[in-house]
Amino acid sequence: MANESKPEVAVVMGSSSDWETMKRACDILDQFGVVYHKQVISAHRTPELMAEFAHNARANGLKAIIAGAGGAAHLPGMIAAQTTLPVIGVPVRSHALSGWDSLLSIVQMPGGIPVATTAVGNSGATNAGLLAVQMLSAFEPELADKLEDYRNELKEKVAESNAPVSYTHLRAHETCA
């Protein structure tokens, strides 16, 4: 967040159909005030654009890349192969195998070319946004503070959701054990 006008994170996806999932990562980045760039880049249909994007990512001021893809899902790994920035892969749910194909394509990277891989689908995109914020927070104390607040809000939501649940009342001679 040092330079508000320059994106620190890129959110890229293999197809516009991935947006319904990937917008969750953008929602998180918005919530934390992280400036980001979003774009459709296909590893298969626009490989030159993908390579140019990955090669120039650091020079363009990016600090992390969130890449979502479904099916063959080569985008995160191919970007990771062409940049030394952290790449977070989001497996997008596919029609054929419910996202298992996407997950395995992203998570099974050869040693030396890591991709931090999240869960399949919407929760994975949310966690990708949070992971990018956590990475940035190592160098931006205000983000670390916002993350603490976020975690405290999660705790409060759990406590609130527990309120309507009735507890089991034991008679004097009974125990929980």
PLM region descriptions:
Residues 17, 102-167:
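C-terminal binding/interaction regions
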Residues 9-37, 42-43:
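Glycine-rich phosphate/diphosphate-binding loop of Rossmann-like nucleotide-binding domains
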